[in-house]
């Protein structure tokens, strides 16, 4: 039986972020998702949630497009490569969820900020908040 905690969208976003980080170092989407979803469980023979797979495979499929969208919102002289891997992947995840899911935009922004607080620092969380908020404002 699956834990309700692992089924929450917040927890699945965390797993998606961890899977995206794994993919930076070479693996496939399903393996990365399976490890992120089951790494602290005894039973690893579970069906992966569609939301998790959709987030990770979507970000991977649209990585170039997402990077272009993010780059358009960076300050002059900054490139996507200058960002940390954590920031890059959180921004990709946030922009993808904003543009590809029915998730309310402010929820997607807040979730990315919370992940930044968990996996980086306050400065990074403020940066992600600023960039994603600017992105949302321009999308409306």
Swiss-Prot record:
From the record, give the cysteines joined by S-S bonds.
Answer: none
The molecular function terms of the Gene Ontology recorded here are:
RNA binding
User: Among its keywords, does the record have RNA-binding?
Assistant: yes
Q: Which SUPFAM superfamilies match?
A: NusB-like
Keywords, sorted A to Z: RNA-binding, Transcription, Transcription antitermination, Transcription regulation
Domain of life the protein comes from: Bacteria
Name the Gene Ontology biological process terms. DNA-templated transcription termination; transcription antitermination
- Provide the leader sequence positions: none
Q: Which GO terms describe its cellular component?
A: cytosol
Q: What does this protein do?
A: Involved in transcription antitermination. Required for transcription of ribosomal RNA (rRNA) genes. Binds specifically to the boxA antiterminator sequence of the ribosomal RNA (rrn) operons.
Protein family per UniProt: Belongs to the NusB family.
What protein am I looking at? Transcription antitermination protein NusB
Q: Tell me what organism the protein belongs to.
A: Streptococcus pneumoniae serotype 4 (strain ATCC BAA-334 / TIGR4)
